[in-house]
Amino acid sequence: MSGGLDVLQMKEEDVLKFLAAGTHLGGTNLDFQMEQYIYKRKSDGIYIINLKRTWEKLLLAARAIVAIENPADVSVISSRNTGQRAVLKFAAATGATPIAGRFTPGTFTNQIQAAFREPRLLVVTDPRADHQPLTEASYVNIPTIALCNTDSPLRYVDIAIPCNNKGAHSVGLMWWMLAREVLRMRGTISREHPWEVMPDLYFYRDPEEIEKEEQAAAEKAVTKEEFQTEWTAPAPEFTAPPQPEVADWSEGVQVPSVPIQQFPTEDWSAQPATEDWSAAPTAQATEWVGTTTEWS
């Protein structure tokens, strides 16, 4: 499919991306029309997709998208959550028209409704989940491209790209690869330099996980500010006292003599004797003692 050109051949880094995202892992079921894209079957029943065929169909789909003069006439659709972010990113990069979320029935056939569209090409994420736009595209003769798993039905699909369309990383990587090839064929980016956009931007992220990450980051920032106010106060400048210069260490350092100040002292033996503590108790003490006779 690549015509034997080295420029269009799959690179090693592309294969590593496919393997890391699990693009080659299909399902346990196999549609008879997808048998041509299967490489082997694992012992646990999972079919392995031939990545060489995946790359060839990816280039064919990119050529079909580039052939449309107006990029807005290409509709990219994903009703599943795992492909909605990728569809929006693909549309922003290539200028296509995205439909993320529920597809309104009659969008391609009912001319009365406000959401009516007449695209020239349709790209869907899952033929099983996006069966409604595929069916309507068959009514109005719109060519279709689909990311197909091993068990995906190929009815009304003109160009099937075999891949794992269930995993979030695999779907995001396939849309990223498709957008990169479209931009390369248009001449927007060069094949000699890597694309500055990372595949991570096309991956689906759970909103609950995003909220947890934001809360954790906020708590970490608060604790960091508290520690900074407590521990990062400016420390007083410490200057070491000058050391005396000693030429000969055997002589030692001479301690300067300090005059001792004389304080007046008193003769404690000359003072008069204090009271006799053995004398009789005071009257107040006798009164307290007298009151205690009642308790006896």
Curated annotation (Swiss-Prot):
It holds the Pfam family 40S_SA_C. Residues 161-180, 205-229, 243-296 are annotated as: Laminin-binding. The modification N-acetylserine is found at S2. It comes from Gallus gallus (Chicken). GO terms for cellular component: cytosolic small ribosomal subunit; glutamatergic synapse; nucleus; plasma membrane. Keywords: Acetylation, Cell membrane, Cytoplasm, Membrane, Nucleus, Receptor, Repeat, Ribonucleoprotein, Ribosomal protein. GO terms for molecular function: laminin binding; laminin receptor activity; structural constituent of ribosome. This is Small ribosomal subunit protein uS2. Belongs to the universal ribosomal protein uS2 family. It is found in: Cell membrane; Cytoplasm; Nucleus. Its main location: membrane. Disulfide bonds: none annotated.
